[in-house]
From Swiss-Prot:
It comes from Danio rerio. Pfam families: Homeodomain, OAR. Residues 7-17, 53-75, 179-195 have a biased composition (Basic and acidic residues). Residues 401-418 have a biased composition (Low complexity). This is Aristaless-related homeobox protein. GO terms for biological process: neuron development; pancreatic A cell development; regulation of transcription by RNA polymerase II; subthalamus development; telencephalon development; thalamus development.
């Protein structure tokens, strides 16, 4: 009876030593590179000689392991303490025997630790390799054990092999990172070299800058004769070729580079004036000669003699304005008059503003300022003339003596009055002008038709 009870207690101890919690702790220890107490205990027990180990332990080892995995897997840890492998409740004498078994296990564990002299290494790779080397002779000495124990040793060897693969992968990762580290170190060296080179280049640039400052070229002072010749060449072409520039340089005692720079600056100046709208034509105002000299806007538009060959678009616009003026002889000056009277209420300036400056030739940036300046002047002069007029000019034909030009000071005084007048006065004049226009439209058209015929 006592021998049977001892066998049951041994089976229970084997079951408890092979519980899943102990196996999980072994897995954790194998990952961390340490030996688990269960493994050390097994190795200590296996290292004992065969005559010392009891025979019933050899026979019941396989059955105890099977019972442990069948009975304890579905029970929680607290119930495993109370129930045995067959599901039966344990008696009160179990605690005493368990205490004895626990003391014996601790003694065997101390002996095994002293015999094996296990020391935990700080590096994981070294501890894993050491554990693999230390496990190799034990696996060779366990060849005479049971097949299930051999299978367990194979599982342990496979886990160790997996750990070695992990160590190799880590070593490969270290090798893959080491070129990057070398490259980063090399880049750091390059950066330092680059900084030194930057410092050297900065010093060279400063030296070159000092040389350039010493060799600075002063501004070229052109004489009046040189400027006249250059302006004459610029009137011929804005983009002279290299032969023309060299010829000018030879004739004016200059270098070709100075001539080229002067033409560049002159073109920039000309483009700036053209964009501003001040420069209308290189030679003067695009109007016929006698009319351009006495036009009220001639001083504002930098008037001058008209070129002998005007633009065909300007000619067509001028002919259209002349035809419109000839259609109303009472409203336009006679052909023999040589100037535009500012006092004419609906004179040639009105037709110029309506017919000529609506021509497509004047739609551009060059004449933008011309429109903005001419519009208010013509409207103000027309309004002032309508206010000064007492009777409509359509009823009586205009004589040549009545169309004599006023002095040029009248146009400038009218412009000065317009600038000095306030916004309210301008609005009042505009209202009166619109009233006069309505009165002209109310007049019977029969007389006007007879005069036109």
């Amino acid at each position: 009876m006592s021998s049977q009870y001892d066998d049951d207690s041994r089976d229970r101890s084997e079951c408890k030593s092979k519980s899943p919690t102990v196996l999980s702790s072994y897995c954790i220890d194998s990952i961390l590179g340490r030996r688990s107490p269960c493994k050390v205990r097994q190795l200590g027990a296996q290292s004992l000689p065969a005559p010392v180990r009891p025979d019933h332990e050899m026979t019941t080892e396989v059955t105890s392991k099977e019972n442990s995995f069948d009975s304890d897997m579905h029970l929680p840890p607290k119930l495993r303490r109370l129930y045995g492998p067959g599901g039966k409740y344990l008696d009160s004498g179990r605690g005493f025997h368990e205490h004895l078994e626990k003391g014996e296990r601790e003694r065997l564990l101390d002996q095994a630790c002293e015999s094996l002299k296990i020391s935990q290494a700080p590096q994981v790779s070294i501890s894993r390799s050491k554990s693999y080397r230390e496990n190799a002779p034990f696996s060779q000495s366990d060849e005479g054990q049971s097949p299930e124990h051999m299978a367990q040793e194979l599982v342990e060897l496979s886990t160790l092999k997996f750990e070695e693969d992990v160590v190799k992968e880590e070593a490969c990762g270290d090798n893959s990172l080491s070129p990057k580290d070398e490259e980063s170190l090399h880049n750091d060296g390059d950066v330092k070299d680059g900084e030194d080179s930057v410092c050297l280049s900065a010093g060279s640039d400063s030296e070159e800058g000092m040389l350039k400052r010493k060799q600075r070229r002063y501004r070229t002072t052109f004489t009046s004769y040189q400027l006249e010749e250059l302006e004459r060449a610029f009137q011929k072409t804005h983009y002279p070729d290299v032969f023309t520039r060299e010829e000018l340089a030879m004739r004016l005692d200059l270098t070709e580079a100075r001539v080229q720079v002067w033409f560049q600056n002159r073109r920039a100046k000309w483009r700036k004036r053209e964009k501003a709208g001040v420069q209308a034509h290189p030679t003067g105002l695009p109007f016929p000669g006698p009319l351009a000299a006495a036009h009220p806007l001639s001083h504002y538009l930098e008037g001058g003699p008209f070129p002998p060959h005007p633009h065909p678009a300007l000619e067509s616009a001028w002919t259209a304005a002349a035809a419109a003026a000839a259609a109303f002889p009472g409203l336009a000056p006679p052909p023999n008059s040589s100037a535009l009277p500012p006092a004419t209420p609906l004179g040639l300036g009105t037709f110029l503003g309506t017919a000529m400056f609506r021509h497509p030739a004047f739609i551009g940036p060059t004449f933008g300022r011309l429109f903005s300046s001419m519009g208010p002047l013509t409207s103000a002069s027309t309004a002032a003339a309508l206010l000064r007029q007492t009777a409509p000019p359509v009823e009586s034909p205009v004589q040549p003596s009545a169309a004599l030009p006023e002095p040029p000071s009248s146009s400038s005084s009218t412009a000065a009055d317009r600038r000095a007048s306030s916004i309210a006065a301008l609005r009042l004049k505009a209202k009166e002008h619109s009233a006069q226009l309505t009165q002209l439209n109310i007049l019977p058209s029969g007389t006007a038709g007879k005069e036109v015929c």
